[in-house]
Regions:
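N-terminal positively charged helical leader segments and presequences
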Residues: 1-70, 122
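RNA substrate-binding interface of SAM-dependent RNA methyltransferases
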Residues: 71-131
Length: 131
């Protein structure tokens, strides 16, 4: 069975190169090479099938083969607001699971009795993208 590899590229249609972190994962970790197939997503519902056309150092170029249709079962918009807990792992787990079930948007709120008043959203964002 063929493994499907998804990569997050924010501007997938207008770009021809994977972002540095994704390129490193494709070339070094998965050891992909010229002609290998990969799937791109922009995080907003666009999915593309692409092929690696070039690699130089830590850079990976691709060509879009086709845009994949995505049927969305529910056309609503689900927004969750949550107060960060004392333990970051719980916030990360909640964000990951909520993304998996189809939550569209997150807001972190600072409540009167919140134990954590600042949250590093970059790690949570990476977890949500990978989910």
């Amino acid at each position: 069975m063929k493994e499907v590899r998804y990569f997050y590229v924010p501007d997938a249609l207008h770009s021809t190169e994977l972002p540095p972190e994704e390129a490193r994962h494709a070339l070094r970790v998965l050891r992909l090479g010229m002609g290998d197939e990969l799937y791109l997503m922009d995080g907003e519902g666009l999915f593309l099938r692409a092929e690696i056309t070039g690699q130089t150092g830590h850079r990976c170029q691709y060509a879009v083969v086709e845009e994949l249709p995505q049927a969305r079962a529910w056309l609503g918009h689900l927004h969750i607001a949550m107060a960060p807990t004392k333990m970051n792992e719980r916030v990360e787990w909640m964000s990951e699971k909520a993304t998996e079930i189809g939550v569209d948007e997150f807001s972190f709120v600072d409540c009167q009795f919140s134990e954590r008043h600042q949250l590093k959203t970059d790690r949570v964002e990476r977890i949500v993208v990978s989910a």
